[in-house]
UniProtKB/Swiss-Prot annotation:
Changing G174A: No effect on interaction with YAP1. The lineage of its organism: Eukaryota, Metazoa, Chordata, Craniata, Vertebrata. Interacts with NEDD4. Interacts (via cytoplasmic domain) with transcriptional coactivator YAP1. One of its GO terms (cellular component) is plasma membrane. The chain crosses the membrane at residues 110-130. The gene is PRRG2. InterPro entries: Coagulation_fac-like_Gla_dom (IPR017857), GLA-like_dom_SF (IPR035972), GLA_domain (IPR000294), Peptidase_S1_coag_factors (IPR050442). One of its GO terms (molecular function) is serine-type endopeptidase activity. This is Transmembrane gamma-carboxyglutamic acid protein 2. Residues 1-23 form the signal peptide. Coiled coil: none annotated. GO terms for biological process: blood coagulation.
């Protein structure tokens, strides 16, 4: 038989599910009666789940788990003690009873706050350091207007008398006139080569 094995499995599953023939299990009831249900809940063969997923009906209350490891309300404490006088006595000494008092330190919040504070201080210190370095670097560079007045050879001494600057060099001469250019002899004043060699014979 050729084909996909998944189609064969799907066919077998559908034929099994759609089977309407009477079976022996149809005579059994789904729900248990009160005696059987109580014996199931109180049997020692069943493994307790230790109050996982809020199964408080199956496991007894625990004061340390419900009120000391986490905050509990008056009703939760009453469920544990099952007596109003014992509950009131406990509630007066409970630190989260709503009447104030000093509670325990939340370590996670303290760690997050301290880490954030230290990080903020480090970032502020780095920002101040970079700003001071930028100002120091900017203070060492002269302004463009002052750059022409300060000679690189003169020492910068604000306390002493200013040293005189050397006189500026004379301006370069301008272009010569036409007559001056003709009268001047230069390298390129030679006559042009003769054109006899370039003529074609007729």
């Amino acid at each position: 038989m050729r084909g996909h094995p998944s189609l064969l499995l799907l066919y077998m599953a559908l034929t099994t599910c759609l089977d309407t023939s009477p079976s022996e299990e149809t005579d059994q009831e789904v729900f248990l009666g009160p005696p059987e249900a109580q014996s199931f809940l109180s049997s020692h063969t069943r493994i307790p789940r230790a109050n996982h997923w809020d199964l408080e009906l199956l496991t007894p209350g625990n004061l340390e788990r419900e009120c000391l490891e986490e905050r509990c309300s008056w009703e939760e404490a009453r469920e544990y003690f099952e007596d109003n006088t014992l509950t009131e006595r406990f509630w007066e000494s409970y630190i989260y009873n709503g009447k104030g008092g000093r509670g325990r330190v939340d370590v996670a919040s303290l760690a997050v706050g301290l880490t954030g504070g230290i990080l903020l201080i480090v970032l502020a210190g780095l920002g101040a350091f970079w700003y001071l370095r930028w100002r120091q670097h900017r203070g060492q560079q002269p302004c463009p207007q002052e750059a022409g007045l300060i000679s690189p050879l003169s020492p910068l001494n604000p306390l002493g008398p200013p040293t005189p600057l050397p006189p500026p060099p004379p301006p370069p001469p301008g272009l010569p006139t036409y007559e001056q250019a003709l009268a001047a002899s230069g390298v390129h004043d030679a006559p042009p080569p003769p054109y006899t060699s370039l003529r074609r014979p007729h």
